[in-house]
C-alpha cells in the first residue's frame, strides 16, 4: 500500500483546521489565506510569527514524527510531496526576521522526522512554473521573485544536497525512467 502526503509547514490539513478555528474565534481580525499586505503585516509581528511557526511545527511533528513514521513502520510506501527542506525554505522566505532553525521545536522536527530512502527534486524554469500555476489555477501562487529565490536554493542550496535533481522539462517517460532507475526498479545500465 502507498501513502501519499503533500505537506508544507503551515499548509497541511491539520494546520488548515487550526487556522479555521482561529478564524471562527477571531472573525474578521484574522487575515484570510493567501498573499496580501494585511497578512504580511500580521506575520511580521514577533508574537504572531512565533505563534504561527510554533503551531506549524507542532503540526509537522505530528505529521512526520507520528503519521509518516507509523505508516512507514507498518510497511507502507510513503511518498512525501514536499518535505523538511521545502518547509525550511518556506520559513526562511516568509519569516526572514525569525531564526527558526534555533527553535527547539525545529530541532525536534528534524529529530523525529524519518529520513527518506530517496529524494527527488524536479526542476523547472520560473516561467514554466508560473504557466503551470495558472493552468492548475493555484489559489495563492508565489510571485516571480519568490519563485526565482526558490529555484536558486533548489539548484544550489545545501538544504537539497541529498536530492536527486531532475530536469522536469524532459518528457514524462524520461523522468519516470530516471526515478525508477534510482529506486532500483530498472537496470541502471
Language-model features: where?
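N-terminal phosphate/diphosphate-binding loop that engages ATP/GTP or pyrophosphate donors
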Residues: 1-47
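Hydrophobic/aromatic beta-strand patches that form the interior of the parallel beta-sheet core
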Residues: 1-4, 118-121, 164-166
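Short, hinge-like loop/turn segments at secondary-structure boundaries
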Residues: 17-23, 96-98, 138, 183-184
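Surface-exposed cleft-lining segments at the edges of enzyme active sites
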Residues: 47-58, 92-97
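Phosphate-binding/switch loop-helix module in NTP-utilizing enzymes
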Residues: 52-74
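A glycine- and Lys/Arg-enriched "phosphate-lid" helix/loop adjacent to the NTP-binding pocket
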Residues: 77, 82-152
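NTP-dependent small-molecule kinase module
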Residues: 127-189
